[in-house]
Every structure is written in structure tokens, then in C-alpha cells.
């Protein structure tokens, strides 16, 4: 497998597409591309068809997906404020593109357009439009019906309203639904960094009703939180005031869950009179949860730890990666440009990297697929997998 990335920031959409495709093609050193990922910044929304046409004139891969996004990633750079086109090419990688649509019916709704293979343990890349496809249903389907199926991707961030989204699939530009790629044989390794760290202790949920949690270990959640805060430093108390999150343990068989074992959800509200809290997830009695905090320093540490752990466990050589990082990260979170991209390149030795800023990140935690926020989710492609 060989992977190449090309990028061009010239304002002319067609010229940028031609130059980016040419750069990526040259990096394949004569090998034929088997998969292309085409990404454009929001400035090129109205010329998405021209971008795709220009790329296909330069290369004609058997599989192509992509989108127009709020900001895009190329190499060690995150291009947030200028027009750009990025082309990511891979050779020697089996790939099959597909699209999905969400159709409402008199009795409910249907997901149409593609059937996941129940017998295969394949990796799927998914790029859903947030306005026409409920991403939570998209993620829950493989969890419930297809255990072992891993999905990675990002909710497309390029549109400000319904109809603004631009998705690429092979020779077509779409404005709704989901585009995706099936990668047989798990040639990609999912890597997910949620940017949080736990505080206090894990508690068993002893009282819950939907998204409302009334008891943690037999006491109101706010009482548990006050007990934790009393033992924190002033700086940590400030984080609780501005960046408090809830972590739900995914694998209840873990004796001592730690960083990376939780799916992180937001705190929606609290009732001081009862001590209960509401979170952005339905929670069952018996689940284990722990309060979490998120800040730039913690997110940097978590990303480094997650990538280093993944690199140490790779079953082969890292050939390249696709990154789906939250549009709330970047300069907004870290105060500097290029944080996630440059950190990944530093830790993985400058591998070919591309991606985009997403409005929700998709990736597995402890073997269960989830939709995240403020997260960096990555598909790390591995050559010579055992």
C-alpha cells in the first residue's frame, strides 16, 4: 500500500483540484490509486461539481468519496480560514463506496441504499449530512445488528442549512444522505481521542430515568460532584465550572476503567432541589459513570497518549491516515493553528494525512461505535497487516 496527499490553496476551484490531484498522484510513484478521498473547503461549495470533474480528469480511481467541509486537514496543517482542495490517494487498498438515505414512512423510517455484511469484520468510513440523516441511528445500527463492525468518520460540516451540504461519491455530487466506503479486511485501525480526563471516582448509576440521573452510588449526583470538587485544586475547580462532562463506561467488565474507557457525553442540566442531572445520553441503572473535565492541556495529553498507544499496537507499518477532528477544536480550543494534525504527524513520523473539521466525530470506544463531540477520530491505515 502507498498513500499520497496533495493540497492547493489557490482560490480557483478547478485549478486547486488539478494541482492537488497531481501532487497526490505523483506521491504514488506510478502505482494506480484504488481509493480517493476528495475534500474541499466551504469557499468551493458552489463549485463542488467543477472540483470533482477536475480531479477525475487527473485520476480515475475505482472508488472516491469526500465532501465540502468547514475546514480541512492536509499533512501537518489545518486549513481553517482559506480556500483549499485536498486529495488523499491510496493504492493497493480494496474499497467499495456506497450511499445511504433516510426515508420516513407511515410507520417510522427506513435506511436505504446499502446493506452491511453481517459476516465480515470490515472497517467502514462514513460521512453523513447532518440535515437529512440522523447520525445516532446510523451508529446504533451496526452496534445492535452487526457486532464487530467498526465505523469511523465525521458528520459533514460544510453546510449552514439543509441543502448546503456537498458529498462526493465516485462521479456524483450529492446534497443529502450518507456517503461511505467499505474497506474489506480491516486495513484501517480506528483511533479515538475524546480529550477528557476523569476526576473523582467511578460510580454505579443507582437511579435513572432516560437521560435523567437521580442517584450515583445511592446519593444524588450533585452531592457526589460536591464531594469531588472539595478535593480539587483551584485550577481544577475552574475546569469543573467551564468544562464538566460525563463519562459512561463502555465495557462493564473492566475492573478499573481509566482514560479512554469512557464514552463522553455533555451535561445538559441539573436540579439543585433534587441533586439530579441530565446528560446527552439515555443511561440505564447499573451503568458505571465518572465525571470528566476537558481543556486544551488535557486534550493535548489525551491525543498524544492515544496515538502513542495505537502506534505501539499496530500490526504493521503505518502508511497514512484520515482524520476527523471536531470543529470546536483547532484554534478555538488550543489557541494555535494545526494542533491535532501536527501532533499526529510528529508522533507517527510524517505519514500522509488528510481530513476535515467535523460537526460530530464517529469512532469506536472499547469496541462500541459512538458519535462524539470535541473529539479527534482517525482511521490509521496499516500496510503488511498480519
Curated annotation (Swiss-Prot):
GO CC annotation terms, alphabetical: plasma membrane
Any one Pfam family match given in the protein's UniProt record, by short name: FIST_C
Membrane topology of this protein: Multi-pass membrane protein
SS bond partners: none
Keyword match Transit peptide: no
Origin superkingdom: Bacteria
InterPro entries in the record: FIST_C (IPR019494), FIST_domain_N (IPR013702), UCP018953 (IPR016741)
Subcellular location, record wording: Cell membrane
Swiss-Prot/TrEMBL keywords: Cell membrane, Membrane, Transmembrane, Transmembrane helix
Spans through the membrane: 54-74, 347-367
Main location (coarse class): membrane
Family recorded in the similarity comment: To M.tuberculosis Rv0628c.
Protein name, UniProt field: Uncharacterized protein Mb0898c
Taxonomic source organism: Mycobacterium bovis (strain ATCC BAA-935 / AF2122/97)
